[in-house]
Structure formats: C-alpha cells, structure tokens
C-alpha cells in the first residue's frame, strides 16, 4: 500500500535521506511491474529431501534471489567474481542472500478480489464511494446476490440487488443481454470503475447544502470526506479491488528446519498456500467450463482465503492452524503490543547491554556506580580489543578474544584505562519517568552484583530485595557526551514533575541525621553542673573527640571521663558562631561542619521534610556542584551516626495509652445510643451505620494522638526509638504507629465499604482470630488492587505520552497577550496550595504591584517569577495573578519557553527542543503507578476524612454570605441553600451590611472562609464576634435534610402509597417508615405547606426526591426549621486512589460521568414548572432580560437548589459530577481548562502527590486542539468535521484573502485516545491504536507524513526532532565551512582512536 518512486528513491530510503513519507493505494500495475520480481504459480515451499526452495514456489530463488551469498541454485556460479550474472541454467542472479529480505513477488488472481480493509473497516470506504450499505456489499462480495451494473433499457436500477430467483425472473423477462448484473469482486470492480467521482462530489456538496437534518448532514459530510480524499489524491477507487496480490519477501516469513525433520514456519506461508491452491483450482475449473454453482463457490473461497491473508478473523471464523490456534495474518503482524510497530520499531533490543541484581554501594560517590569486572569485560570488549591491537599486544581480533577469555593481566589494565571517563547508563524497569535511566561513571568491583548509590534509589524506585537493573554502554562520542552532560546522576537531583529534590537521604541516613540534630535532652543544670560555653565550633569538636561521643546517658550512667572534658551529643551547650552566642547541642555543631557556610548555622531538628528543604535551598544558593558534595556528606554522616546511635526498637517501646479502656467504654456507650435511636425509628439503618463509623473514627484519632504524645515523652534523657523513626520520617507513619500501640481501627471490605465494628486490639496486645480474619480482608484487597491497577496506570501513561509526544519547546517567546488567572487553592478555611507555589517559575502577563502602592512593582510583565518574587506576591496578600500558560500559547507548533516557564528539573528557563509533552505525561502517569502500588501499605485500614463541626481558628466577626437561613425552635440558624459560606473577618468596627458589601466585591479578605452544607446548624448569629477555638457550626454528615422555612400545616401532594411512596417496616425496630420510591408515573412527590388547617392559602412547596424518608405526617402543624424529610447520604466509602485513577482517566478521556449533574445555562433565579414525562421541569429565569432556560431533571436526582435561589451560569443544580463537554458549551474554554486542571489536581492532592499545574495544562491543551465546523462558508472544510485550530485559521485566512466567506466553528473537547488517533502523523496514530483503520484512512486520501513528531522519526530510524536532535541544534552544522568540517572529522577520528 506504500507508494514508491524510482530505484533512486529506494537508495535514498536506505540511506535514510528522506523527510516525508506518503502512503497510497497500490494499483495492479504497481504491484505487478514495480514491486514484483516474478509470479508465484505453485504453493510448494522447499524440497523435503534437499531442503532447497522449489522453483516457482513461495521460496523460489529465481524470483527472490539466492539463499547463499554469491551462489546460484544449481551451483554453476560461485564466488563474488560472478556478481550480477544471471545463471543460464537455473535463472538465479548471483548476488547477496540478503536481497531475499527485499524482493517481492505476486500472485495473479483468477478473479478480482475485494481488499477486506476497504470493505470491512468502519466506515466502509467502498460502501461510502458506491453509496451502498456494508451488508448489501457483503452479499455481493461473497456471491450471495447479484448487483445491477448496467440496467440497460429494463426497469431495473443501477446497484439494485437481485437474489437468484429474482435474477432468473429478470433474465426470463428481459433476456440475458438486456442488462448487466454480476456478483463478487468483479461486480464491485466494475461499479467502482464506472463511478464518476467529480460529479458525485458535486452532488454530495449540493445535498449537504440543502439538507437541514443534523444527522443526515453528519452522514453526508462523512461520505463527502472519503470521496474528496479520492478526488484530491491520485488514487482510483477500483484499486481497492485486487487483481494481483503482492507476496512478502521470503526472509520475512521464514521456514526453519528443526531437529527431527520438522519445520517451524511463519503463519503467512500457510495463508499464502491456501490462496495459491484455491487460485490454481479456480483457474483449472474456469478452463473446464464447470457449472456456475461450483465456480461461484470456488470464487467465494478464494475471496475468503485472501481475506484471511490480510486480516484473519475479520470476516467469519478465523482460519486455524496446528493446535487450533488462529493464524497470524498481515494485519496481526502490525497490530498490538507484539506487532511490527510496537515490538520492532518503537522498542528494540540493544547490544552492549547487561543486567544484574543490585546491591547498595554506600562507599560510592554520587556520580558513580559499581560495575562487576566480568560484566565490564564483556560490555567493553570492542574497546579493549582496539586498545590491545593499538598497543601491539595482539595482532588479530581472534587472538585478542582469546586473551580476554584467559583474563590476562594486561586486559585488566586496559579495562581500567578504558572505563575512565566512559559513562554507562543504568536503567530499572519499569521506567516510569525520565529519572528511570541515568548515567554513572563505572567503578570496577569484585562480585556479580551492580552497586548503586543509596541516594539515587528514590529516582529509580529501587530497593535491594532482589531488584535488577540493566546497564547500557553509549558507544559513539556524541552518545558519551550526551550521557556526561545531560544524564549524569548529579544532573538529576530534582523531580521534573514538581521541582522537589528526589535525591534526599532516607531510612538510616534520615534517622542518623535526625538523631544528631535532635533537641537537647541532657541539661547539665539538672545534673548539678552548668551549661558549657565554647568560643567556636572547633573547640566543640575537640571536646567531642577528647571524650568520645557519649551517645546514651543511661549506658554511661553518671560516670564522665576523668578529665571532665567528655560531652554528651545532646547536651545543651553555648557556642559563639559568627559573633553571636547560640544555645545548641554538640550534635548540631558537628552536623553544621558539612553544611555550606552560605546556608548559615542550622539550629533545629532535621526530619526528612526539612532535609529536603535544605537541599533545595542549598541548590538555589550555592549551585549544583556544592549541592552534590553536600548530598554525599549527608549520606556519609547519616549512615555513620545511625550506626553509632544503634537505635533499635523493643517491644516495650510500644506504649499503650492508659486512657484506652476509658475511651473504648465511652465509644461503646455512644454506639449503643445510636443503635437505640435506630430501634426507635428516629434514624435509618444507613444513618446508624454512618454515625457508628463517625464515632469509631473519632476514637481512632483520639487514641492515635494519645499514643503519639505518650511515646514523645523522653525517659532518662532518652528518646523513644519508635518516636525517632516516625518523627524523622525514616520509617513508618502515625497510622502504623496507631495500629501498633492503640487500636487497628476500622477496616474496609474488598468493595470499599467500611466494616462498622472496628478492631479494638493493637499489634502489641495481639489480635483475636476473628480480628485477624477481618484484617486479612482489607490486606488482600490492597494486594489485589496493586496487581490490577498497575496495568491500568501503565496504560494511562501510554495514552498520555501518545497524546503529548509532539509538544516540544519550539521558540523562546510566542508574544501572546492571553493569560490564565490562578489563585490560592483552599478547602473550606484550610489552605491546600498557597499562591506562591502555583506562580513560581511562571511568566507574568501583566505588572504586579504592591496592593495600594502602584510605585512598588513586585514583578514586571514578561518576568519569570523567582521563588523570592513568588513569596513577595504571596506575602503582599494578592488574591490572584495573571500568568501565561501552555493553554494560551500561540506557537504554531509545540509551545514557547515563556508560556511554559521554568524547567523544574534544574530551575532554569526551559530550553529549546525540550520534550515537555513527554515530561508532562510521565509526571502525571508515574505517581499513578506509585499510588496504585502503595495502596496496600494501609493494610485496608479505613481512611475516611470528615469533620462534623466547624471551629473558629482566630478572633473576628462572623459574616454570613449568600446564605439562606431559618431559625428553629431552639434558636439555632439552619442553612437552607448549598452555595453560601461563613466568613471570619477582622473586627474593624464596621456595620454588618458594610462587611457583606466589601466581601461580595472582594474588597477585603476574610481571615477564614467556611463553605457550609445544606442543613448545617450555625451556632453563632450573623455579625456576632467569635473567639479562637469557639464552635461556629455543626455539619450534618449523614443526611441531606429538607427543612421547612415557614410555619403552617402539612399536606402531601402526589405522595401516593404504592405508587410514589411505600411504607417499609424496619426489620429491627418494627417501626413503619414512609419512603419516596422511584416511579414511572406523572406524579411529582412534594410536601405543600398551607397557612391554615383548611388548606386554602398555600405558603410553600418542597419537592421530595426518591429515596427520602418523610419525617412529618399529613395535617401536622409545623414550625420553621422543622425537618420535613431526609435523604440518607449512603454508606461512606473509603477514599483511595482506586477511585482516583479511574477518575483521572475519566477526566482526560473526557467521558461523561455516571449520574452526571445538571448545570445552569444562564444566570438567574430558580423556579419549578411541574412535571413532564417523569421529569421535573426546572426553569432558570434571568430577572433583567426575562430570558428562560428549561432543564428536564429526572425525579431520581437530588436537587441542590430550591425555588427562589439565585444561580450563576455553570453552577450545579443537582448532585453529581459535571460533564466537561457541558462546561465547554456553557462557560467556554477557559472555565473548562480551569475545571479539568483542578479536578485532576484534586485526585493527586488527596494522595499527597505534588504535580505542577503546567504538566496537566499541556495534556488539557492537547485535548482542546480541535474545533468542530458548524458552517463551512466558502472554505473546503466540511460540516461537522473536526479540524486542527491551526488548519482552521489558515483555511479561513486563505478564504478571506480570496474574498470568500470564512467558516464558523466551535471548540471541541476530545479524550486523549481520540486526540492521539487524530494526530497529523498517520505513522504515529497507527502505532498507537486502531492500526488497520488508521492506515486504511491514510491510504485512501494519500496522506503525507512530514515526520515532525517523535514517534514517527523513531519508527523511520531518524534522529528525534527534540533535545540535541532539535532543528536549531542540527542547523549549526550548516554554518561550518568545508575545511572546518574536515577538521571536526579529523578530531573525531583522533578522539575515537584515543577512546578506543
């Protein structure tokens, strides 16, 4: 199917000197005359006795070339001297045997055969050109019915189908020669040949203009696109029917003799043999004038044989081979993970590589790795041989190899010499991000395991429990240079995803450093001495050395050394540092000897988080080299100190809180009360379950905190080892600690539901058999999750890489004026992500001034914000900042450096050619895999997050904003709407109305904001003063209440028992509850409130959703604030990335979520208009313009707005997740981008994973690359077609220049899979998914791939257009003059001889 030019083109292809690739449909002439070297007439393969290929068969030497180099079939000509001669006896050309990998043949078919790809791949290309359905075509192609090709003067219609009976009837009526009707490939060929595409195109365009129906227009546009593809290319539609079949070169479908006289063969040979056998049989039958039925059957079998060859199993049952296994057709060769694209073109095995188990190498420098001698000998063999020859130690390669095998002493000397300055690459699978491959200087070691520096383990996610790593040797000077300059471990100490240090001490190292830096535990005053003072650090160190480290006081007792110079490592001392007297400990003074002076004296404890901050600070202040030295010193110090401290954990270190019994008794009492409420019918079973879980969660937290305080206490000036391990961040966390010493707590079932009876034992006390059994439930869920989700996460990463692989930095500055606005991310009053973290390293789009002072500019437009600037902006109290983003970048290809901002891996502005798309995909995909693997570490311990009350964090005035409240009989304010919040503001002596006005216009900033849910009970009045720690509100966690806001009498409307409601007797309590159920009728269940008992004056109505439990009775008198009904929230599920990963996939695939929420289309006020077709009619009315928008909402959905509520465009009206496509249609592109970025971030933030926004923005940018044409105007674009934005603007520009009407379009959101398949490059799309469909599509319209992206260049064997292969870097060569080029060449060869 590839189009090929002259033989010169073939030479260019071999050299790789081409910059584009065109694909088309091959004509019969091309297959026979250009590709083929001869016709195959026999199905034979090789002679069973001689094992030589049969003449004219599938392996014929005359057609394909000799099987042995420079030797013909009969042996008349041997040796290279006869090169190019064609043997006069056997007809074989004397040449290299490798031509058998290149030369093709053909099979001349007895009848035309339809190519299955063009007929079966949806949409059917043949069907669309002919205007026939796929099922009609199928009946014609497989000889079931005739199709009229030329109706002549009969009453038949062209393309009409005739079955056998009808055909005979028509022949009798009109005679055989009055019309032409055929079946099979021949009929399709004739129809396609007779099709006038130009006039068909005009006719389709005309129909498209006249048609009003959207569906018909979409159908026509699809057909038009296919026809247009044929017209605009040099393809002819009849080429979709084959008269010759090309045969793949024999060495690509080998037949290999095995021991015992059997053969291993490629499935293709079997498929070709079937085709040849059937073809030959058909030719014979046709010569013999056989009856039509037999001929027709044979033709159908030939069609099926060719179908199986091209795509086995696409039509009918697949053809089976030995062992009842479907044979692999040509399509299967390309498709999937083991197909040609992914197995051989995108992923190749490499030479000069090895793998071995890894062990820790604490003695290594940061840029080194330990390479076993035997391994190095094998890997560097060619280099050793060259050096041995240069030295004159050996003269032939064979003798050099023997010398190496012997292990001669000079070989080891040469090896030592060679590996100096020759980096090797280490890789650990799975390579989830670019830190999975790094370069190191090899150090030769004994043994067979590779040694790895402890600090790079985090980047590789490696541990030493049997992990293996691969070693690769960069061979060329360029490769070595790239490895040295770009890939060395010291250049990779920060995560590209967040800019945080990845090379940080962990485990023992953290523990040692923390122990050294711990707060003073030995106070001389308490032991009758006085605090020692020292004149400088040197004196402290001298005292330490003199007395030796007295590490643990209880070991030494009160015995100090005779001289009195001994000094405790945690003793409180005074020392003069930089002219100031500081209170510190000898341990801290000792630690500061390795800290770069520019960072100042570190005088505080050092948990792992602070070490990480210190490393970042070090890099910013003193640069990379000093940081790497500091890291090596930290490693050394950490290991030494943790060894000297000899911290180990004993059973007695696990303290059980004394208050445990008391707290448990209290909890059991509370649970009993809840159970009693349930039995009395006050609450439902769901509420009882939820409340019980809340009680136990609270107990869990209480005991956990009690235990932590207990082990924090020091005994005999000694730290609890458990506390040291957890607090330093070396191992374990509070949750595990709680399970060791307090209680295991609530466990989850495999389906995520929480078991309500917790495990009250802890591991120190031991578990009962039942408790152990319950534990294993959750633990197994974790392990199963790990296995299943790893695959999901890997697939997500693959899709992300595919969609973003083309995004590279192509220019410095695109000059756009567009921007996005970012602000602090808060959850309630809690600040989740400060503004400084969101704006650091981003380009500001307009000047930022100090609030109230225009003369003080914090940052100028175009500045890339430094951490100091970002901090200043945050400190100035600025709410939001306008920054440039890849979402708004206007670069024609890729994105510009200014819109991207800093490269987080090194803190510099991103460089040209950097593959930011792949970095983004890896940054999002990598933690996904990490998290799925990390699920089981909680051992199924329920991790639910909820708080039943709101407490003021500071003093201030409480202001209600956008809240509708009603005062109940107890004087509490109950919240009636969902969208409001409580604000805590500074007491400035203003009136309440002033505060409200200032808050709504954002003129003042609140000290804290608390969004409140429907039904929340506010305990403080609007405008009242509150003090820190005061309870402000109680939140209803278990139900969504429906509260009455006016007094009156209850009247049930449409609450018909047995239809819209049912009485359910509670099994445990025997009490009967009235529950609203789902129903199909025209009923609208609601409670109406009347002012009087006669039900004359209506005061208000309240819609009751299905599933709600009615809490009032017909005719009951009620007061404001009373509960009318309650909707249980359902059982609380545990929060886990198990829910999170599918959520990320759902967002980036732009899928419609289940139970999607309805959102308001305009700003306005909510009203209801009754019911229609089992749906509630909700109206949003704009009070100013009078415009109305109707929403039909299912009765089963829970409304979160009520009549009279003001809503804004895009606000949720019902519970659930929002459909992203609706946000795009209603609120526009900017809002959608913001929504997607925030939603993806929320999933990762919940798991404590830090990913920079810019990575998610790149993926979102790729999802919004296309627009959908709504009016083509005078352009060549089609209605309903999805085109690239750039293409759309370009086409419009051309049309406007010619005076035509431009096209209209709307932005469209595509999921990442669809976006990947819609890429400009057909090679890239074909290697991703749907290979056959992509290639069929590309071939029909003769697409050209300009090889601009990464994947297509890798597949074609070119250098990738990124990094050092980026265009501008490659162009440097053009400026070198010829002499200089020669010089460079000479230098290279010199260099090679030195390196060799």
Curated annotation (Swiss-Prot):
GO terms for biological process: DNA-templated transcription. InterPro entries: DNA-dir_RpoC_beta_prime (IPR045867), DNA-dir_RpoC_beta_prime_bact (IPR012754), RNA_pol_asu (IPR000722), RNA_pol_N (IPR006592), RNA_pol_Rpb1_1 (IPR007080), RNA_pol_Rpb1_3 (IPR007066), RNA_pol_Rpb1_3_sf (IPR042102), RNA_pol_Rpb1_4 (IPR007083). One of its GO terms (molecular function) is magnesium ion binding. It comes from the Bacteria. It holds the Pfam family RNA_pol_Rpb1_3. Keywords: DNA-directed RNA polymerase, Magnesium, Metal-binding, Nucleotidyltransferase, Transcription, Transferase, Zinc. Binds 1 Mg(2+) ion per subunit. Zn(2+) 2 binds at residues 814, 889, 896, 899. This is DNA-directed RNA polymerase subunit beta'. It comes from Chlamydia trachomatis serovar L2b (strain UCH-1/proctitis).
